[in-house]
């Protein structure tokens, strides 16, 4: 479901990203394929430097359908950014991608807290993240971070995933599956 980013996937991902239902909500809204290719190269370099972790989201047959990134990694925290192409909306990919990525981050990297900033008008993302049992609204708990993401005219809600909450949640999920 997730794999490291590769440049040969950029054509498919760029075409999915430019859909009007997706484009306003991506972290890097590129205006051209060449710009998207450049940004992807930068992300690969940043991952090598340890400042971000970026993955391609795949469907069941291995086609790229979106991306998921942890960026601004600092003091065991980072920000999560995810987008999925419109043809794949409502099919459970978002939740599965997040769970796989969070498991990788919390079990394979030294990450304790993951922040998600969601534009107040992005109802689709808000509903999707609030379905996840390990995500909490963090506007008050992390007020300084909340203030820092709301310094422009664009308004965001801040959510977070703590390592302990996620691991407890997936332990419960795994127990339910086993019984």
Question: How would you describe each model-predicted region?
Answer:
Residues 42-43, 104:
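A generic secondary-structure signal
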Residues 21-42:
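Conserved GNAT-fold acetyl-CoA-binding loop/helix
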Residues 43-56, 66:
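A short helix-loop-beta-strand connector motif used in the catalytic cores of GNAT acetyltransferases and
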Residues 8, 17, 35-38, 52:
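Generic alpha-helix structural propensity
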Residues 1-11, 15-21, 58-179:
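Acyl-donor (CoA/ACP) binding surface of acyl/acetyltransferases
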């Amino acid at each position: 479901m997730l794999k490291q980013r590769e440049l040969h996937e950029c054509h498919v991902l760029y075409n999915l990203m430019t859909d009007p239902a997706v484009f306003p909500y991506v972290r890097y809204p590129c205006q051209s394929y060449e710009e998207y290719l450049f940004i992807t190269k930068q992300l690969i370099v940043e991952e090598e430097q340890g400042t971000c972790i970026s993955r391609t989201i795949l469907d069941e047959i291995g086609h790229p359908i979106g991306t998921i990134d942890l960026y601004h990694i600092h003091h065991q925290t980072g920000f999560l950014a995810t987008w999925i192409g419109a043809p794949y909306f409502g099919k459970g990919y978002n939740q599965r991608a997040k769970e796989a990525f969070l498991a990788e981050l919390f079990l394979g990297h030294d990450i304790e807290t993951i922040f998600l900033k969601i534009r107040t008008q992005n109802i689709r993302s808000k509903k999707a993240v609030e379905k996840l049992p390990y995500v909490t609204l963090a506007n008050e708990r992390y007020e300084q971070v909340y203030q820092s993401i709301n310094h422009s005219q664009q308004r965001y809600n801040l959510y977070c995933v703590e390592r302990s909450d996620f691991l407890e949640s997936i332990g419960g999920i795994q127990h339910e599956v086993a019984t």
